[in-house]
Amino acid sequence: MAGRHGRIPLRRYRPRAAAPRSSSLIVWLHGGAFSHGDLDMPEAHGVALALAEAGHPVVTVDYRRVPSWSWWARPRPGVLGGVRYPVPVDDVSDVIGQLAGEAAASGHSLVLGGASAGACLAAGATLRALREGRAASRRLLLAYGTFHAVLPPASPELRARIRGRHGLAQFRPATVERMNRNYAGRIEAMADPFAFPGGHDLAGMPQTLLLDADRDSLRASGEHFARELRADGVDATHHVVAGSTHGFLNRPGEPAFDEGIARAKRWLVSA
């Protein structure tokens, strides 16, 4: 698909003829800390296959990714070069703008979803479309996303879930800040509501399902975002997949993958 920054690779998944016809066209964004991931990873391909098998047409998006970053070293000061915000959000916005017409013509309702960094891009692109008066998704499906420039404090319950050996592979607040700064490219962009919608005015956002991992420090952002959505009058459902860790949709065959997909399927046909 043509976008303002060039071609945007897409992959389409069509349900089998025998599958029940869905009223939703799902656009799905993989994660990867804004810097990694592709259309072949299970978090893209596996999720799309599972949803298509349930009768939903799915489009996965290979949005432009920012350069790799270090978990330990702070980004250099100043403006970072290369692909940075808003380019990935622009790609998502361009895809949604073009697919909205296709969805309407085929009688489908557009659902935008994503996992981890992809969830942030989905939320940011939707908020921008609403504020700019452009076509936006009718519903949002967000899995273990990070929506805040600075990771919110974890609840006592979450802290207990990521204690001890469960804390070894967690995203620390400083790590999240490095990841987000690398994506933002400029200090000023860290406060941009379309880069990190958490903590900003979310009134008018569409009905949203948030799926979070149980033992995942990033759940603090998902839980806060769900509360912020509800406080602004948005119909937001939040569910924690018991026993799961970050990235469970990238691991087909695990019980958490199956539960996450099952929750998404039920929600998609609930309205």
What positions do the PLM features span?
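Alpha/beta-hydrolase superfamily serine-hydrolase fold, recognizing
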Residues: 1-271
